[in-house]
Swiss-Prot record:
Stated role: Intercellular signal essential for a variety of patterning events during development.
Species for this entry: Devario pathirana (Barred danio)
PANTHER family for the chain: HEDGEHOG, INDIAN HEDGEHOG PROTEIN
Gene3D superfamilies according to UniProt: 3.30.1380.10
Domains: entry comment: The indian hedgehog protein N-product binds calcium and zinc ions; this stabilizes the protein fold and is essential for protein-protein interactions mediated by this domain.
Name this polypeptide is given: Indian hedgehog protein
Post-translational events: The C-terminal domain displays an autoproteolysis activity and a cholesterol transferase activity. Both activities result in the cleavage of the full-length protein and covalent attachment of a cholesterol moiety to the C-terminal of the newly generated N-terminal fragment (N-product). The N-product is the active species in both local and long-range signaling, whereas the C-product has no signaling activity. Cholesterylation is required for N-product targeting to lipid rafts and multimerization.
Length: 58
């Protein structure tokens, strides 16, 4: 993220879910999922952010 968008940081908005905000089968309940966005919350970056996550084997 920092190499692609200088000054933009990765934001983790949720990892573990114990309040039931995700679907019943969500990996958040096992601590094996994470919701992420960028610090500028620019939705136009989300597709590339998803690609970067896949490339990083996340």
């Amino acid at each position: 993220v920092m190499n692609l968008w200088p000054g933009v940081r990765l934001r983790v908005t949720e990892g573990w879910d114990e309040d039931g905000h995700h679907s019943e089968e969500s990996l958040h309940y096992e601590g094996r999922a994470v919701d992420i966005t960028t610090s500028d919350r620019d939705r136009n970056k989300y597709a590339m952010l998803a690609r970067l996550a896949v490339e990083a084997a996340f």
